[in-house]
Amino acid sequence: LAELVGRSEHIVRATALEARSDWTLIGGRRRIVTDTRIRVEETLGGRPTAESEIEVRVLGGIVGDIGERVDGQAELVLGEPSVLFLMPITPLVAYVTGAAQGHYRLLSDAQKSLRLRPSPHLPQLVRPEESAAAVLSGATLEEARALIRGAAK
């Protein structure tokens, strides 16, 4: 967790509002990326974002009848809140730090408490017991706040 926190400029609780996929050049090759506009509802760590809404870019998506899947990428669900660890590309566009390792869905448990769940496409990790996912998965939002702040010290 300390590494993920240290590599992230922004750590936020946010909701995905809309997404669009398009072609872009990455490393001299045409690739499909999906940009999701998120509404930042709370800064959990790092610096606050410059705006209340920013774009989060992940590799892969569908443009026309062509799809490109990139394993291990975060999958933001429209309308669903999540905790995101972000690295800015520009002031208004960011990548998810560590791809799916930096995305946690916020889902209600039986007591209506929001709990962090790993991104749906989290790959198999080396030393998973030491990963941020092992520490954060199942934590309430309150517990996650404390864990993130503790890891930042």
Mark where each language-model region is.
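Transition segments tied to proteolytic processing and entry into folded domains
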Residues: 1-153
